[in-house]
Amino acid sequence: MKNLRKYLLLLVTFLAVSPTVFAQDDLLSLIEDEKPQTDFAKASFKTTRVINSQSLENTAPGVLDMKISHRFGPLNGGAYELFGLDAATIRIGLDYGITDHLMVGVGRSSVQKTYDGFLKMKLLRQSSGARTMPLTVIWFSGMALNSLKWQFPERNNFFSSRLAYTHQLIFGRKFTEGFTLQFMPTVVHRNLIPTSQEKHDVIALGVAGRQKLTRRLAVNAEYYYVLPNQIADNLRNSLSIGFDIETGGHVFQLHFTNSTAMVEKGFITENTGSWEKGDIRFGFNISRVFTIRQPKD
């Protein structure tokens, strides 16, 4: 009888204490859920490119982004050239995300038969909440190789003369759900320059922005200002304006630009197109992504 009373007492004690323990667990769970979370800015731009320039976005880890970029001839070619549609230049590129912060890319352009490769690293990422960071900051380094046949093959030519390098610090902010602005101080180094009056190292200041119009439509613009006395007087600053159209796994970018080249060395230091003279090209970029490696849970 005494043992029975002992068991009953233990049972009553357990039933009385259990709700308190579970209530404490639930309270602790609620407190943990209420801890401030870090919210990172997403979709500052639809793709890793604004138009010609790199954007604040990187390709996701394990994702391969195939880009086809196309530029037609100048609109001032008139009806005989079908306002530029008879002529075209193209770049095909592959970008791959290695980590959340690092991506690499390669490409080949018909302009000067250029091969290019680059590395793009996200140093800081805009965030709010538990950890606040007002800006996204990215470092970009690229190399371009001109593979045209030598103009004067009989003289001594050096492989290094084919190379040019670009370094950029890209920083910007997504101010609202629809508006993003970024700046791109840039240095382009050319091993070979056309004349002794030009500089091997060219400094340019770029600015780009995006305004979202609808859920799947946005307008983009970018401009590069090359500081004076670095390149030939007949060269022009690059200005491009266009639209992003998102359709499932594809992003179409339709734009007008005074630049033919689609790598930094070309559209920053070798651009001859003039908006005032109608030397404007219609073009498009198409982006298609493929998941090569599934993200870890």
Name each region found by the language model.
Residues 9-18:
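Bacterial N-terminal signal peptides
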Residues 1-6:
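Positively charged n-region of N-terminal signal peptides that target proteins for export
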Residues 234:
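Positively charged, low-complexity, intrinsically disordered RNA-binding extensions
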Residues 195-228:
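A contiguous binding-surface segment within folded domains or other stable secondary-structure elements
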Residues 19-23:
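Sec/Tat signal peptide C-region and signal peptidase I cleavage site
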Residues 24-156, 163-167, 172-183, 187-191, ...:
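Transmembrane beta-barrel domains of Gram-negative outer membranes and organellar outer membranes
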